[in-house]
Amino acid sequence: MNASNWSVYLILCENSAFYCGISPNPQQRLAAHTTGKGAKYTRVFKPVAMRIVAGGMDKGTALRQEIAVKKLTAAQKRQLWEQAEKMPSET
């Protein structure tokens, strides 16, 4: 797997909150979250949609970016969501 293939993503959950994570394969990770095999948070508050915040980075950079996103306020995450790349399944 390419070392510069990691992405930071936001998931909009059914409670209108955002869940942030990283993955080298966001589509596969969304499937895991959707089927209850992802994070505990997304097992409780089901995913509605996912968007890529940043991509094409190594794992360490992705982890640092994830931490930065998690420190944002809800309003800042909403703004980031609006600017983020839509997933092919989102129309």
Curated annotation (Swiss-Prot):
Domain of life from the UniProt record: Bacteria
CDD domains per UniProt: GIY-YIG_UPF0213 (cd10456)
InterPro entries with a match to the protein in the record: GIY-YIG_endonuc (IPR000305), GIY-YIG_endonuc_sf (IPR035901), UPF0213_domain (IPR050190)
Chain ranges of the GIY-YIG domain: 4-83
PANTHER family tied to this protein: UPF0213 PROTEIN YHBQ
Family: Belongs to the UPF0213 family.
Protein's name in the database: UPF0213 protein NMB0361
Organism: Neisseria meningitidis serogroup B (strain ATCC BAA-335 / MC58)
